[in-house]
Amino acid sequence: MSQILKTSLLIVGGGPGGYVAAIRAGQLGIPTVLVEGAALGGTCLNVGCIPSKALIHAAEEYLKARHYASRSALGIQVQAPSIDIARTVEWKDAIVDRLTSGVAALLKKHGVDVVQGWARILDGKSVAVELAGGGSQRIECEHLLLAAGSQSVELPILPLGGKVISSTEALAPGSLPKRLVVVGGGYIGLELGTAYRKLGVEVAVVEAQPRILPGYDEELTKPVAQALRRLGVELYLGHSLLGPSENGVRVRDGAGEEREIAADQVLVAVGRKPRSEGWNLESLGLDMNGRAVKVDDQCRTSMRNVWAIGDLAGEPMLAHRAMAQGEMVAELIAGKRRQFAPVAIPAVCFTDPEVVVAGLSPEQAKDAGLDCLVASFPFAANGRAMTLEANEGFVRVVARRDNHLVVGWQAVGKAVSELSTAFAQSLEMGARLEDIAGTIHAHPTLGEAVQEAALRALGHALHI
């Protein structure tokens, strides 16, 4: 083992939370070491958020081209297209490489020492790193920030290998299967399943719950289910997985009837879990919430000067939550007064149509004892949506009846992910219905549906 490396802040994990914490710490003049065994950017940048959106975009463009090869109301006609999936993957990888290089450059710019290797906890002040290039390095610190992220949940009855793949393999196909079965009807399975279907693959989704996206209310998920069926995706809802079969998988429905679903490949997408095993984290004896490290509203763990952020600290497992926590921890270590208490953290499903939620749903508001106004505005009445051939879906607002304080937003439709900023900002700033309704929204935009939903809640929507 080489000479001991000493630092003020040691960060384990170079994903969105870890690298943002490192950059902010560097900006604040805190000597910082970041340890990452894989590529900078973590799951999100390398095998999650970014590559999946690239594949989704490529699949959508291919579907458009196929549509134009038949009949298009726009008058566009092209010859039947083909796709070179290897080139698609190269394009996707180039985006990832550019972004990871950018992260590395930012860390270097702010004086962060990046150590490539796998950290193993020794105690609350030190780790041993198995260096990627061979050998080992002991690092000691004043503050230890745990940002190890999460990993895919595996199914013992359907182990990975051969034709059974995880989202990581699904994002880098060497070739496209003829038929794909997706196990899991959550956002990961549906995003990838939709992309594969648009690329021409026959897709079936198996979900144990009676509907897709069970974490969202049915009014939001119904348009997604309808769109999937129109696309030709087979939905086996309320079906439990029994295991692999010779030609695919075996499932059982609610009535106890078993059947085989044929597949060339099976994608397991049944969720993620904190990466809290395999690097001696348990030796610290930290308070835990199941597999997640328990933290307070400053991301402090039960051990002094040991912090945890992002997926390792539990739900919601979102990159933007991890980034916000990472920035906050760096500022706390620098002596600033901070607290992680967002009014809302937006969440997006990049299905087709997309789904975005921020704050309380009508049901959640009711459960919280709030008497609320709930109003929706359909994209069928929005001019911009019509010009985009995307008049499916709606924007919904939830606001207190007594003072009109907005407590929640939901939307389903084309490109509604871009409304998430407006939703979160209005909630964070304590906007009331009158604030949204009285703000002039540019025309023609999808965002006008936000204003119209607020107007409708007040009883005087203009375009419906």
Swiss-Prot record:
Keywords: Cytoplasm, Disulfide bond, FAD, Flavoprotein, NAD, Oxidoreductase, Redox-active center. Disulfide bonds join C44-C49. PROSITE patterns: PYRIDINE_REDOX_1. One of its GO terms (molecular function) is flavin adenine dinucleotide binding. It is found in: Cytoplasm. GO terms for biological process: 2-oxoglutarate metabolic process; pyruvate metabolic process. Its EC number is 1.8.1.4. Gene3D superfamilies: 3.30.390.30, FAD/NAD(P)-binding domain. The keyword Phosphoprotein does not apply. NAD(+) binds at G184, G185, G186, Y187, I188, E207, A269, V270, G271, R272. Its cofactor is FAD. Binds 1 FAD per subunit. Belongs to the class-I pyridine nucleotide-disulfide oxidoreductase family. Homodimer. The branched-chain alpha-keto dehydrogenase complex catalyzes the overall conversion of alpha-keto acids to acyl-CoA and CO(2). It contains multiple copies of 3 enzymatic components: branched-chain alpha-keto acid decarboxylase (E1), lipoamide acyltransferase (E2) and lipoamide dehydrogenase (E3). This is Dihydrolipoyl dehydrogenase. The lineage of its organism: Bacteria, Pseudomonadati, Pseudomonadota, Gammaproteobacteria, Pseudomonadales.
